[in-house]
């Protein structure tokens, strides 16, 4: 008989299992061991986290975006601006230099809770706009996700898409969807988030690789 302590475990594993760690499985009633490397992970692999707890001018991810994954996602949660009626924006980095030229091309649509239509676009932007007119009242913030498509590729322009929800200046709820590209085929190696005016006061930003 197998000692139950072998199954229940004597010591907790405090970190992710190594590829050579093993599990016991029942294969048609026969116990077999299985390497952790053969067990598929989740679709999203957390690579980095930045928690903003006081005012900063920007949040940068300058490592972790490379050819390891085809696509990357950045989630932002409870992002609160210092200034009223501003937008969260994003720039990309090429060869460790954040681009501030007018090669950001995008369009977005959305709705506000008063049935107002949101529409914005730019063919000569200096950054991607990710949401709509955030309020800075104590209960107002924005959350959403940005997808970078094949940032390490060098054949096509650098595509992105984003969706966000938030509370506008004036207390209206809103939802926006935006997509576009940076007009260069060079590999992207970083991203920067910043407000159209003023600081980011609070928020959590997470970078994921997408399997």
Predicted regions span which residues?
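Surface-exposed molecular-recognition determinants
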Residues: 3-11, 19-31, 35-211
């Amino acid at each position: 008989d197998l000692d139950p302590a072998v199954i229940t475990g004597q010591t907790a594993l405090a970190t992710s299992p190594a590829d050579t760690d093993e599990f016991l499985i029942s294969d048609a009633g026969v116990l077999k061991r299985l390497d952790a490397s053969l067990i598929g992970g989740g679709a999203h692999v957390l690579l980095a986290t930045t928690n903003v707890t006081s005012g900063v001018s920007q949040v940068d991810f300058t490592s972790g975006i490379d050819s390891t994954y085809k696509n990357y996602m950045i989630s932002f949660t409870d992002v609160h601006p210092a200034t009223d009626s501003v937008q969260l924006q994003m720039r990309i980095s090429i060869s460790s230099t954040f681009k501030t030229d007018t090669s950001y091309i995008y369009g977005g649509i959305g709705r506000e809770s008063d049935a107002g239509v949101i529409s914005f676009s730019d063919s000569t932007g200096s950054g991607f706009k990710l949401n709509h007119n955030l309020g800075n009242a104590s209960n107002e913030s924005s959350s959403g996700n940005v997808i970078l498509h094949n940032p390490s590729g060098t054949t096509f322009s650098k595509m992105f898409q984003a969706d966000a929800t938030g509370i506008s200046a004036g207390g209206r709820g809103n939802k926006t969807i935006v997509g576009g590209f940076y007009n260069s085929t060079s590999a992207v190696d970083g991203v920067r988030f910043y407000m159209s005016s003023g600081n980011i006061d609070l928020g959590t930003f997470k970078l994921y690789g997408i399997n």
